């Protein structure tokens, strides 16, 4: 059992009614009057729906034991993404609604880890940084580095990130997958 005050983003727990929930955001909130509460943004792992809720810090939940296996992202069709276990070549289907954030960072044939809750496939874990190529951005303007505000760039997965002014189409960038931000040129 784990207390609500110990839950952090990325953790998965099971509610008393059997729902498998992943924490997207968690923060302590102390109202002017009353007791401290935990404000959380959560996702139902099975349905993909997200919701906001509050819990008392002492509320307890059953922490879900999630196992991972190495896999390769194959392709997506309709509303399903397909992955292959790289050890036993078994293929798995995951509804896109459950992993739409992760799909912004991975290309076909990328290495990931598939998450299992018992024998049920519930999601994927991606690397903390990925290398992606810029497919569209505004041209660099000489002397425009003074402002330092950057410009939007579209990457090969369709993700749009803010990049420095010197970045051009065709360059490979390192992207932080947790925040969806530019780190450096590759």
From Swiss-Prot:
GO molecular function terms listed in the Swiss-Prot or TrEMBL record: translation elongation factor activity
Residue ranges crossing the lipid bilayer per the database entry: none
Database matches in NCBIfam families: efp (TIGR00038), PRK00529.1 (NF001810)
Cellular-component GO terms for this entry: cytoplasm
Keyword Protein biosynthesis: yes
Entries under SMART domains matching the protein: EFP (SM01185), Elong-fact-P_C (SM00841)
Its job: Involved in peptide bond synthesis. Stimulates efficient translation and peptide-bond synthesis on native or reconstituted 70S ribosomes in vitro. Probably functions indirectly by altering the affinity of the ribosome for aminoacyl-tRNA, thus increasing their reactivity as acceptors for peptidyl transferase.
Metabolic or biological pathway, per its Swiss-Prot or TrEMBL entry: Protein biosynthesis; polypeptide chain elongation
Name of the protein: Elongation factor P
Intracellular or extracellular location(s): Cytoplasm
Lineage top rank: taxon: Bacteria
